Amino acid sequence: MPKFKAARGAGVQEKHAPLAEQILAGDAVRAGTREKRRGRGTGDEEEEYVGPRLTRRILQQARQQQEELEAEHGSGDRPAVPRERTTRLGPGVPQDGSDDEEWPTLEQAAARAGPGYQAEVVVDPEDERAIEMFMNQNPPARRTLADIIMEKLTEKQTEVETVMSEVSGFPVPQLDPRVLEVYRGVREVLSKYRSGKLPKAFKIIPALSNWEQILYITEPEAWTAAAMYQATRIFASNLKERMAQRFYNLVLLPRVRDDIAEYKRLNFHLYMALKKALFKPGAWFKGILIPLCESGTCTLREAIIVGSIITKCSIPVLHSSAAMLKIAEMEYSGANSIFLRLLLDKKYALPYRVLDALVFHFLGFRTEKRELPVLWHQCLLTLVQRYKADLATEQKEALLELLRLQPHPQLSPEIRRELQSAVPRDVEDVPVTME
C-alpha cells in the first residue's frame, strides 16, 4: 500500500479526520503558517538582535580558538596589539602605482624574522687570525659613488667642452636649479626616513639617463638603513642588470661593510636589502660577492653575514657556477673558502669545467708554506663529499697527494676516506657476467 501523503498546508491533526472534513478542508483556502523573510535591503524590518548570553558564548569560543592558535604557533606570550582606527575618504585605492612597505622597529623586525636572522655574529678568534694571514696587506683604496661620479663628470665635462667648442662653442649644459632643489629635498627626506611613502621624484631616478649623477645629489652615505632598503628594492626592480650591478657595488656594498665594521653586526634593513638585491642574481654576484672577494680585505664576520644570504635564498645554477669559477681562479683569501663551501652545499649539478677549476684551485696549495685555515680544509671536504663521483682518476690521485702535503689531524682522514671510496668518472662500469 502506498505511503499516505498529507495535503499541502494540512496540519498533523487532520491526518485521521473523516473523509468529508478532509474534502471540505481541501477546498477551503487557508493562510500559510510559514513566514517569508525579506532581504535586509528593503529596510522595512528591524535588524536581528543578538542577546547578551549568545554574545558571551561567541566571544568565549573566539577567545579559546585564539589561545589555541597562539599556543600552536608559539606566540602566546605576546599580547595582541589593538589595531588603530583610521578614517579614509573614498575607496581604499593607493594614491600611486606602487605601495611601499612600512617597516617596524628593529626589535620587532628581528623578532618577526625568527631564528634565521642573527643580530650578533659569533666569530672564532683562531679562524679570524688564520684568515687575516691571507688578507691583502696593502689593499687598494675603496672607491665610493662620489669618487666615481666626480671622475665621470670631470671626464664627461672635458670631453663635451672639447667637442662643443670645436663644433659651435655652446656652453656645457648643467642641471636645472629646480632639479637640484627637488633632489636636495629628497636628500633631507631619505636622511630621516623610517617608514611610509617615498617621494615620487626618487622613484623615477632609475628611468633617468643620468641616474648616477642624480643619485649623487641625494648623498647615499647619509641615507637611513630603511631608506637604503627601499632604494635597493626600487633599483633592483627597475634597473637593468649592468646598472643594478653599479648600484650594488658603489652604494650598497660600501654601506654594508661600513655598518659591519662599526657595529660588529648588520642592521636588519641592510640585511634585507642584501636579500632583495638577489632579485638580479647576476648583478648581485658581480656587484657584491666578487668585489668582496677581490678586495682581499673581507673579514670573517662579513663573510658569515653575506654567506647567510647564499644559504637562505634560491640562486640559479648558471650564476652560481660562474661565481664559483671566478672565485676559484682569483687570488686566495680566507673568505673565498666560506663562499665556495656554501655554494657547494647547495648541491648543484656543476659543469665539469667548474669542477676542474675547483680541483686546480686546491692543488695550487701544494707548495704553500703558511698554515692553511680550517675553513680551507672544510671547503675541500665539502667538495669531495658532494662531487667525489664526478672527479677523474688523476684528480683523485692528485688530491690524495695534496692531503699528504697539507694535512689536518681531524679532517684529512675523512677526506681521504671519501676519496678512496669514490669511483672516478672516467672508470667504466664492468658488466657482471653470469656463469
From Swiss-Prot:
The modification Omega-N-methylarginine is found at R40. The keyword Phosphoprotein applies. It comes from the Eukaryota. One of its GO terms (molecular function) is snoRNA binding. Residues 71-87 have a biased composition (Basic and acidic residues). The modification Phosphothreonine is found at T154. Residues 1-102 are annotated as: Disordered. Signal peptide: none annotated. Keywords: Cytoplasm, Methylation, Nucleus, Phosphoprotein, Ribosome biogenesis. InterPro entries: Bystin. The modification Phosphoserine is found at S98, S165, S412. It holds the Pfam family Bystin. It is found in: Cytoplasm; Nucleus, Nucleolus. GO terms for cellular component: apical part of cell; chromosome; cytoplasm; nucleolus; nucleoplasm; preribosome, small subunit precursor. GO terms for biological process: maturation of SSU-rRNA from tricistronic rRNA transcript (SSU-rRNA, 5.8S rRNA, LSU-rRNA); rRNA processing; stem cell proliferation; trophectodermal cell differentiation. The keyword Phosphoprotein applies. Binds trophinin, tastin and cytokeratins. Required for processing of 20S pre-rRNA precursor and biogenesis of 40S ribosomal subunits. Belongs to the bystin family. This is Bystin. The lineage of its organism: Eukaryota, Metazoa, Chordata, Craniata, Vertebrata.
